[in-house]
Amino acid sequence: MPVILDGKRLSEALQAKIAMAFSAYRGPKPILGILQVGNKEDSNIYVAHKLKVAESLGFLTKLVKMPENSTQDEIIGTLRNAAAEVTGIIVQLPLVSNRIENLQEILDNIPIEKDIDGLSSYNLASNYNCKDNFLSATPKGIILLLKHYNINFRSTVIALVGQSNIVGKPLAKYLSNFKNNTIKTYVKDTPKDDLHEAKIVIVATGVYQSVTADQLANGTVLIDVGIHRQGKTIHGDLDFASCFKKASYITPVPGGVGPLTVVALMFNLIKALILQNPNLDHEFLSLKEFINI
């Protein structure tokens, strides 16, 4: 019987560890900053959840919400001002504006020591093996999940289906640091004739059934990053019922990767606090294994 990778329960346990580490802490509180452009319903839900988790841990928050179709210069100016007042800041994507000329230029205005979502060019170009790098929250959440369940991701064959800057590309770079790994990368439409060779398959295409059960070997570890809402039903990029039969471990949607993305962001926020206040490093030794992913 495949093991369901319970991201919700792990997220709750990790939040409890963070709360414990901060229970006796008397230093400056981390401040989570979020810049949102427009009023997209999905974004509102995600932003509210991030703020709720941060505040439940006793962190401070700052949400800066800009009107739809703000200009690139307006967004950059607002981002710079907001970043100066917080420990770490994220730009909630997508930005609802038809006046953006270069999204990466906006993201590159996040100070590197505050880029807790890891989307600046500096972080995207890194190999995530330096103390000042931030691995994006979703890849970091995936690593937290694999580590917790003692799933080998250091000397195996791993397939990454989907090559976005948010998930696929940074995760491929991080996993490539382990020299005994074989990393196979696919975009959503490329042939996957050799996908059955992978021991771990991570799917993040945003397309339902971009990987199907017949492409997988028996005993595959399946990590589904996608999320799709159809009426009252929520599912991932995989057809859970058919892929479940091929899996040794599998993430549910919801309740798999999603909850860990938010807690990974909190670990990155703590890392930003330490980078800006090196004297605080000793305060969070109990969290070091999570912060330094």
UniProtKB/Swiss-Prot annotation:
For this UniProt record, the keywords arranged alphabetically read as follows: Amino-acid biosynthesis, Histidine biosynthesis, Hydrolase, Methionine biosynthesis, Multifunctional enzyme, NADP, One-carbon metabolism, Oxidoreductase, Purine biosynthesis
**Reactions that this protein is recorded to catalyse:** (6R)-5,10-methylene-5,6,7,8-tetrahydrofolate + NADP(+) = (6R)-5,10-methenyltetrahydrofolate + NADPH; (6R)-5,10-methenyltetrahydrofolate + H2O = (6R)-10-formyltetrahydrofolate + H(+)
Kindly list the residue ranges recorded as spanning the membrane: none
**Is Metal-binding a UniProt keyword of this protein?**
no
The keyword Chaperone belongs to this UniProt entry's keyword annotation: no
| An example Gene Ontology biological process | L-histidine biosynthetic process
Pfam families per record: THF_DHG_CYH, THF_DHG_CYH_C
Entry EC number(s): 1.5.1.5, 3.5.4.9
**Gene Ontology terms for molecular function:** methenyltetrahydrofolate cyclohydrolase activity; methylenetetrahydrofolate dehydrogenase (NADP+) activity
Q: Which cysteines are joined by disulfide bonds?
A: none
Check the record and name the InterPro entries matching this protein: Aminoacid_DH-like_N_sf (IPR046346), NAD(P)-bd_dom_sf (IPR036291), THF_DH/CycHdrlase (IPR000672), THF_DH/CycHdrlase_cat_dom (IPR020630), THF_DH/CycHdrlase_NAD-bd_dom (IPR020631)
GO CC terms, sorted: cytosol
User: Which residues are recorded as binding NADP(+)?
Assistant: 162-164, 227
Q: In which pathway does it act?
A: One-carbon metabolism; tetrahydrofolate interconversion
Family the entry assigns: Belongs to the tetrahydrofolate dehydrogenase/cyclohydrolase family.
Instruction: Describe the task this protein carries out.
Output: Catalyzes the oxidation of 5,10-methylenetetrahydrofolate to 5,10-methenyltetrahydrofolate and then the hydrolysis of 5,10-methenyltetrahydrofolate to 10-formyltetrahydrofolate.
Oligomer status and interactors: Homodimer.
User: What protein name is recorded for this chain?
Assistant: Bifunctional protein FolD
Organism from which the protein derives: Metamycoplasma arthritidis (strain 158L3-1)
Q: What's the gene?
A: folD
